[in-house]
């Protein structure tokens, strides 16, 4: 990829779950050349980690072409999973070191595929600490969780 001509996009994501498991939602803020767009979705029965992951999947999927992305999440699970743990999981056929199946493998596979289309710098920000875009995402995710409209078909519960 020729990074000099790729669009540079900032993405902020958050997930929320009322009960964990329970109704959940994700929130996304995307910024390109100073213009912001927001996305959210609510699910009837899911987990917080699934919503954190789905936020990143949906955000990257919404980019119509390969981009340079700075993706900021308050989820260490997402950031560490996609930057560190996933390499071993893939080598072991989506099994953890203890030979047990990777939890949320369906979403890890989707996130991996979406991330491969882009050049992504995965960043972490402390949640509920006054970070403007993270607070926006949190509000979007919570509102979506309070008004679920979809089923999380990958959630086994």
From Swiss-Prot:
InterPro entries: RNase_H, RNaseH-like_sf, RNaseH_domain, RNaseH_sf, RNaseHI. Its main location: cytoplasm. Endonuclease that specifically degrades the RNA of RNA-DNA hybrids. Gene3D superfamilies: Ribonuclease H-like superfamily/Ribonuclease H. Mg(2+) 1 binds at residues 14, 52, 74. GO terms for cellular component: cytoplasm. Belongs to the RNase H family. This is Ribonuclease H. Its EC number is 3.1.26.4. The keyword Cytoplasm applies. It comes from Aliivibrio salmonicida (strain LFI1238) (Vibrio salmonicida (strain LFI1238)).
